[in-house]
Regions:
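NAD(P)+-binding Rossmann beta1-loop-alpha1 motif at the extreme N-terminus of oxidoreductases
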Residues: 1-34
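A general structural motif
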Residues: 9, 56, 81-82, 110, ...
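Short, charged/polar "capping" segments at the starts of alpha-helices
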Residues: 20-25, 93-96, 150-152
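Short mixed-charge
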Residues: 29-42, 110
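Rossmann-like NAD(P)-binding element
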Residues: 36-86
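Rossmann-like NAD(P)(H) cofactor-binding subdomain of soluble oxidoreductases
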Residues: 65-127
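Internal alpha-helical scaffold of NAD(P)-dependent oxidoreductase catalytic cores
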Residues: 127-188
Length: 188
């Protein structure tokens, strides 16, 4: 996703819980993508979450659901009024968990938190600064918390992600989460 956004010309700052995970991207200055999208996308890496969030309009959180609370806790001191945080994907009630964690940490900023029903890309990391995009979904539901702000959330990201469509509320994106159905089946 970072490589694709960089390739499209969007300013991208990348932060990871393990800074070593970004060494290859930092060295290359971005991410090379191949597959249904081909090219090199410029990506800035940040070792500091404060630097990554500073001045960002939209924060895309792409981590396993088990990390939503931890990432929210780490973001809480640095988020500012007007920023949007979108969990990709939210999985089951991710936006609710993220919002509660921000409040627990004392974040008083007017931050709009939302979630996508699933990840937009079928992709895999193929190298330290490379990814293969096998496909991009045509439509993904997304919702904000509170639901009345979903239009505001989507207006800000439509230029980058025209595939996002409004869901009625985060319970729709959470309870229609295909990962909760698909992944346990594979294990069984």
């Amino acid at each position: 996703m970072a490589g694709h956004l960089g390739l499209l010309g969007f300013p991208v700052r990348l932060w990871a819980r393990d800074p070593r995970a970004l060494d290859g991207v930092a060295e290359a200055g971005g991410v090379t993508v191949d597959g249904v999208i081909e090219g090199f996308g410029r990506v800035e890496t940040c070792s500091s979450l404060m630097a990554a969030l500073d001045g960002a309009d939209t924060v895309l959180v792409v981590v396993p659901a088990s990390a939503h609370g931890d990432v929210a806790r780490r973001c809480a001191p640095y988020l500012r009024d007007g920023q949007k945080v979108i969990l990709m994907p939210g999985r089951t009630a991710g936006a609710i968990e993220f919002t509660h964690a921000l409040r627990r940490e004392g974040c008083a900023a007017d931050v709009l938190v939302g979630e996508a029903q699933t990840f937009l890309y079928a992709s895999r990391k193929t190298g330290p600064a490379a990814a293969r995009i096998h496909g991009i979904k045509r439509q993904v539901l997304a919702a904000a918390l509170p639901a009345r702000r979903t239009h505001e959330l989507l207006t800000g990201i439509k230029p980058a992600f025209p595939q996002f469509m409004p869901a009625r509320w985060v319970w729709k994106t959470s309870l229609d989460n295909i990962g909760a159905i698909f992944h346990p089946t594979v294990v069984l």
